[in-house]
Amino acid sequence: GVMPSVAALTGAGTLVVSIMAGKTLGFLEAGLPGAAIVRAMPNTPAAIGRGITVAVPNAAVNAEQKQRAHALLAASGAVEWIADESLMDAVTAVSGSGPAYVFLLAETLSRAGVAAGLPEDLAARLARETVAGSGELLHRSPLDAATLRQNVTSPAGTTAAALDVLMASDGLEPLMRRAVAAAARRSRELAG
């Protein structure tokens, strides 16, 4: 396995940063006794420097090592530190798996556009740019997502009609809660 080969490289002052999904600090510590370990969960937008990584250190990590880990992880985007490792399953479900949810939104928006009569290539471009632009607006704006949504919604307008469907009791929120719960449950299963 990988642990013996990593263990051979560790010594005093060595910092191990793990991005192995589902591998807890306890698992890592068992294979690397005494090592300073940071468990991290990045996401795929890290590939363009726009990811978010959530990290949790073990007790052996000192302040200088935490700063080094932060600098390393920050090269791929934002970094959030947590003290409670039990949150990592929910983190994995929200930000680790989250890009797939956004990509699925673009896919389904595109298909809905085709169903509404748009040519496939136009629907795909409109969906891609709408999702990308909205994400960038959310990123740059000081306003939260709810306020941005409200700002684009005219009373009794077209957006309001669509949101009535998406925000119904069986709409997007309960669906997303079930999806995130399923991903968190699977993360716990993978951890053993």
Q: What does each of the following model-derived ranges do?
A:
Residues 21, 96-97, 155:
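Glycine-rich beta-strand-to-loop/alpha-helix junction loops that act as flexible
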Residues 41-46, 92-102:
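Glycine/serine-rich anion-binding loops at beta->alpha junctions
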Residues 1-55, 59:
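Rossmann-like NAD(P)(H) cofactor-binding subdomain of soluble oxidoreductases
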Residues 2, 24-27, 68, 109, ...:
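Hydrophobic alpha-helical segments typical of transmembrane helices
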Residues 38, 87-93, 145-150:
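Short pre-catalytic strand/loop immediately N-terminal to key active-site residues, enriched for Gly-Thr
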Residues 128-192:
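NAD(P)-dependent Rossmann-like dehydrogenase/reductase catalytic/cofactor-binding core
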Residues 27-36, 52-90, 101-140, 186:
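Internal alpha-helical scaffold of NAD(P)-dependent oxidoreductase catalytic cores
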